[in-house]
């Protein structure tokens, strides 16, 4: 498959990923009985919940986007008693995100059951704003300049180790590992090489379970829930070890050390939940972004040639020179457009709200998908699903596409880690294609979601380091 010749459409490759829910199963039986006895005159209790359960969240959302009417801005539906609104239109999305009366809501309460008070995954709590400001400060340009050399070295030392000891490489796992090792080294001052691999599978299983969790009440007897608890305990213990090592490290970033001290040992669980959230935001989302970029670039020799020629022009891989590189930055922009780190988020109307003559009742739960907006043919043209870095070369800043390029969200809850994600992606993409030969082996893509958008759950590759 050559991506320069065909478009890779997530819509054509979307697959069912059914969710088993005891609640939905029992409710469906009750619904069937009521429908039978009432001759279908009483509305379904579950609403569209069964469609969500049968197809999985990813296909459910994409199907509704495909089925929308021309010029339809949003789709209101119901999951049980919860009123939902899936937004299709980019301009409306941006206005919702910028509206101070539209904030995190009920769906984040569900996430909090699983992740606790993580900054990226919980509802807003007492320390949330202070932690958010700390993350922004942590990833300031001045700090990114400082960490770039060590981040580069640690990630590629880990890559060299992996291609030496492993015969069969999975690019998904490789990117997760090098990102995790690099992130923990520069942020916490901790070398996690000897413990990184043990985290990947239970953390991944944790995310997959949460992605399919639709139970309003946790059913603790469910075997899948028990597996979730086992994985959660393991992941929390891993974070506990990381925290202990960070406290002893002389190289832990001072901003992060202050956060460790601020939460302290009095609430160990909250501290672990915060660190887990930071680690997830620092390596998991970026690894998924890099997967999409590397896969796309691998299939286009022209892009590789242009990229490597530019690398020759900017041989220094420091932060300043990476920022100066127009073609590399266009590759990263195109990657974040097609593979946004967070593909779906929720917001809640805290009051009755009217936006552009569209009325939304208090309590409405909005589903907002950057993935839909950033692949909208009405915004990005007929090649919206093609990987084409050139589209950013001469983009008019006043154009609709420029205004709706929001891969990291906008407003009061925009992504505090976006600068780090861009930096890490730029480092890996630039160095990987210049100093290594990477070949994608026989595979089948299966786009899916598990918190983040995933181009595939596995991608077999061959990676060889080139001789100088």
UniProtKB/Swiss-Prot annotation:
GO terms for molecular function: heme binding; iron ion binding; monooxygenase activity; oxidoreductase activity, acting on paired donors, with incorporation or reduction of molecular oxygen. Its cofactor is heme. Keywords: Heme, Host membrane, Iron, Membrane, Metal-binding, Monooxygenase, Oxidoreductase, Transmembrane, Transmembrane helix, Virion. The keyword Membrane applies. It is a multi-pass membrane protein. Its EC number is 1.14.14.-. InterPro entries: Cyt_P450 (IPR001128), Cyt_P450_E_grp-IV (IPR002403), Cyt_P450_sf (IPR036396), Cytochrome_P450_Monoox (IPR050196). One of its GO terms (cellular component) is virion component. It is an enzyme of class 1 (oxidoreductase). Disulfide bonds: none annotated. It is found in: Host membrane; Virion. Pfam families: p450. Its main location: host cell. Heme binds at residue 415. The chain crosses the membrane at residues 22-42, 172-192. SUPFAM superfamilies: Cytochrome P450. PANTHER family: BIFUNCTIONAL ALBAFLAVENONE MONOOXYGENASE_TERPENE SYNTHASE, CYTOCHROME P450 FAMILY 4. Belongs to the cytochrome P450 family. This is Cytochrome P450-like protein L532.
């Amino acid at each position: 498959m050559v991506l320069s010749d065909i478009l890779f459409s997530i819509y054509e490759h979307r697959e069912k990923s059914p969710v088993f829910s005891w609640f939905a199963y029992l409710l469906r039986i009750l619904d069937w009985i009521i429908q039978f006895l009432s001759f279908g005159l009483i509305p379904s209790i579950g609403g569209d919940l069964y469609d969500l359960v049968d197809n999985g969240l990813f296909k459910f959302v994409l199907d509704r986007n495909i089925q929308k009417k021309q010029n339809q801005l949003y789709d209101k539906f119901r999951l049980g008693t919860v009123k939902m609104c899936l937004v299709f239109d980019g301009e409306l999305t941006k206005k919702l995100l910028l509206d101070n009366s539209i904030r995190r809501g009920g769906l984040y309460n569900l996430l909090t059951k699983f992740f606790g008070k993580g900054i990226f995954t919980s509802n807003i709590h007492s320390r949330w704003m202070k932690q958010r400001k700390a993350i922004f400060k942590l990833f300031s340009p001045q700090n990114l300049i400082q960490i770039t050399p060590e981040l580069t070295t640690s990630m590629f030392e880990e890559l060299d180790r992996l291609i030496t000891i492993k015969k069969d490489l999975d690019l998904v796992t490789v990117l997760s590992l090098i990102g995790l090792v690099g992130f923990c080294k520069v942020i916490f001052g901790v070398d996690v090489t000897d413990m990184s691999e043990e985290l990947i599978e239970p953390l991944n299983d944790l995310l997959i379970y949460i992605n399919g969790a639709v139970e309003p009440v946790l059913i603790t007897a469910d075997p899948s829930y028990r597996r979730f608890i086992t994985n959660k305990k393991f992941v929390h213990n891993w974070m506990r070890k990381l925290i202990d090592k960070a406290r002893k490290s002389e190289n832990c970033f001072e901003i992060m050390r202050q956060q460790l001290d601020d939460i302290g040992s009095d609430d160990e669980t909250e501290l672990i939940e915060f660190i887990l959230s930071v680690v997830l935001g620092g390596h998991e989302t970026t690894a998924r972004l890099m997967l999409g970029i590397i896969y796309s670039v691998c299939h286009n020799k022209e892009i590789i040639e242009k990229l490597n020629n530019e690398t020759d022009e900017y041989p220094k891989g420091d932060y300043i020179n990476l920022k100066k590189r127009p073609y590399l930055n266009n590759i990263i922009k195109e990657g974040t457009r097609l593979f946004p780190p967070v593909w779906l988020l929720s917001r809640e109307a805290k009051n009755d709200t009217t936006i552009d003559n569209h009325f939304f009742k208090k309590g409405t739960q909005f589903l907002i998908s950057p993935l839909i907006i950033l692949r909208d043919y009405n915004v990005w043209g007929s090649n919206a699903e093609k990987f084409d870095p050139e589209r950013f070369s001469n983009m008019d800043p006043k154009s609709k596409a420029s205004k709706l390029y929001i891969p990291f969200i906008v407003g009061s809850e925009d992504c505090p880690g976006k600068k780090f994600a861009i930096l890490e992606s730029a480092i890996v993409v630039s160095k990987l294609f210049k100093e290594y030969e990477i070949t994608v082996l026989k595979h089948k893509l299966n786009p899916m979601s598990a918190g983040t958008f995933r181009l595939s759950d596995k991608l077999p590759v061959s990676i060889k380091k080139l001789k100088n």
